[in-house]
Regions:
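Short C-terminal tail/terminal secondary-structure segment
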Residues: 92, 225, 236-254
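Residue(s) in the substrate-gating loop at a strand-loop-helix junction
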Residues: 137
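C-terminal helical subdomain
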Residues: 177, 199-231, 235, 242-244
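Substrate-binding pocket helix/loop in short-chain dehydrogenase/reductase
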Residues: 93-95, 99-105, 205
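Active-site helix of classical SDR
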Residues: 118, 153, 161
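Alpha-helical segment proximal to the catalytic Tyr-Lys
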Residues: 123, 166-170, 233
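Conserved glycine-rich cofactor-binding loop
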Residues: 13-15
């Protein structure tokens, strides 16, 4: 589905991002992973392809993002898709408990990184008539307690996706977002293990989706592969829920 496409993927080193990296390679793409952590060689070897470029990049630093895009263009000559996946969710706090530095960090990683990847990638997407995909979250539509700033960034991503879709449609550039619910990733597992009521949390998360237990990240990766592919060539401005129906309404979970 993604044969011969050059895909830039932020936050591709673990969790949903890593599942997307594997799916994109399987679909035929060359992937350029931008991640704050250096990817170990043995992890890249799991992809079983030479069609990868891994760059250590602080996505909140404009100069580093600019340098990363210059490196990608020097190596491949074009960009066909950008998947803005990098995000942080913690700390778990109400708004009044949030410090200025915590606010700035979440805004920088979750939102300003999209500004930077667009600023340095859009000229190349205009040439390729490519696409942009943003990773949002169900909480950006329905809210969540004790995650005020994270929720705000995901709600902003939903609105930004629609605005970008309108702005770049004249250039035949599609812009969409994928909106997961709870996904069984190492990050979520680590967080739940730290909670005093971890057993109750795990039971709740596994009941959250009407379609069944909390899925692994590959279900999100499959949806992302579709949205980046030509099969979605007439889809833009869409916030695609991949949530097993978790956002449909209140359910009795006990």
């Amino acid at each position: 589905m993604l044969e011969n496409k050059i895909v830039v993927l932020t936050g591709g080193g673990d969790g949903i991002g890593w599942e997307c990296a594997k799916a994109y390679v399987k679909a035929g793409a060359t992937i350029c992973i931008l991640d704050k952590n250096q990817l170990a060689e043995n992890k890249l070897e799991e992809l079983k392809t030479t069609k990868t470029l891994a760059l250590t990049c602080n996505l909140a630093n404009e100069a580093e993002v600019a340098n990363a895009f210059n490196t990608i263009i020097e190596k491949y000559g074009r960009i066909d898709a950008i998947h803005n996946n990098a995000a942080i969710a913690h700390p778990s706090k109400t708004l009044d408990q949030t410090s200025n530095s915590e606010w700035d960090l979440l805004m920088d990683i979750n939102l300003k990184s999209i500004l930077y990847t667009t600023r340095y990638g859009i000229a190349h997407l205009k040439k390729s008539q490519g696409c942009i995909l943003n990773t949002s979250s169900m909480v950006g539509s329905i809210g969540q307690d004790n995650h005020a700033v994270y929720v705000a960034t995901k709600g902003a991503i939903n609105a930004l996706t629609k605005a970008m879709a309108l702005d770049y449609a004249p250039f035949k550039i599609r812009v969409n977002a994928v909106s997961p619910a709870a996904i069984n990733t190492p990050t979520l597992q680590a967080w739940s293990q730290e909670q005093p009521n971890k057993g109750e949390i795990e039971k709740y998360l596994n009941k959250l989706q009407p379609l069944g237990d909390m899925p692994a990240g590959d279900v999100i990766a499959d949806a992302c592969t579709f949205l980046l592919s030509n099969a979605a060539r007439f889809i833009t401005g869409t916030i695609l829920p991949v949530s097993g129906g978790a956002e449909l309404g209140y359910r009795t979970l006990i």
